[in-house]
Amino acid sequence: MKVGVPLHELVAYLDEYLRIKQIPDEANAVNGLQVENSGQIGGIVAAVDASQATIDGVIATLEPGEPPPILLVHHGLLWDGNVPLTGRRYRRVAALLDHDIPLYAAHIPLDVHPEVGNNAVLAERLGIRVEGWFGSYRGIAMGVWGHAPASLSTRESIALELDRVLHTLKGSATLIPGGPERPARIGIITGGAGNMIGEARAAGLDTYISGEGPHHTYFDAMEWGINVVYAGHYATETLGVQAMASHLGERFNLEWDFHDHPTGL
């Protein structure tokens, strides 16, 4: 039988490492431990979303008599304040409790972390050395930026490289070619941050990478003279949870796995 790690020890470390209490988020978003268990964990499962498919996937991997893994996600269950545990929410929480699986969520705290954050890790995978931060959200800077490396010498090459590092099909990343053919200063805010194009422009960037954005951002990009690449909300947020799980696995000597449930969005 595996020797489990006390849940409270891992949670205390994560809360401090990710600055859970210090980083602001949406008004009713809950970051940190969302569902507790009986006290021991035997591994780590990372995922983007705490969906029913994700939870069912974790349950399918459980070994009888072994301590369960902790489920680490970017998009947790608790976003909208005090609401009844009914319907879909009840079914997901009940499945976690029935199988003693704890759930830990980190939204904005994971996006902005300088080591395992979605933005920082994507920059690293693209070969971009982070030189600064931009994009104000409730008093903190959301995005990272740096100069384009030689491997990203054209705006088209950025879209192709995003498909490669995010393991998406060629052509998945959408390029809005509003800026220069040869990028110089590239910014990144993963997820659904298309409305931050203005912040990227104000920071003097000529190319902006995000997951997705509303229709009008096409014209924003073309008329403001900035390249925008949308590489998928889900895809751009797969890297942070994996980096976080890898970091925890090494620190606490736990095996970890990533459960991939792409949405195509």
PLM features per residue range, with description:
Residues 1-265:
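Hydrophobic structural segments
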